[in-house]
Amino acid sequence: MNDQQKKEQYSGVRDQEIRTALDQHWAASDANDIETEHRLYHEDAVLEYPQSGERTRGRRNIQNQRASQPSKKRFTIRRIIGGGDLWITEFILTYDGKPSYTVSIMEFRGDKIVRETQYFADPFVAPAWRAQWVERDSG
């Protein structure tokens, strides 16, 4: 096996390890297992919410901020895509029964998240004028 093949094999194994860790992260998030949910974050991780202009620095601050959320939340994963150091998760985050369509962009260093950026959007009613060109998604 040449160096390029070894690198590709390592990359594939690492990607699978990160994907497995992300599956565990989102399952822990949905189960409100705050400790397991945040194991994947680097000590100096940064979490950004561009829509509100907030930035949280440090794994403990991220964990404490999320643990203090007063609403009951649920996570429904639509898809996870990525490779290498960049991973994206699309999910529906439901707070007290109200859905928010969410995109999480995670940047990794090694096997830990060093930066996460999340965007949130409320559902909206599809306009009638587009009906002839679109399919309706039940989710």
Specify the residue positions occupied by each region the protein language model found.
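A beta-strand edge to alpha-helix "cap/lid" segment located at domain peripheries
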Residues: 2-13, 63-139
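Alpha-helix C-capping/helix-to-loop hinge sites
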Residues: 25-28, 47-48, 90
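A solvent-exposed, acidic/Ser-Thr-rich amphipathic alpha-helical stretch
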Residues: 34-84
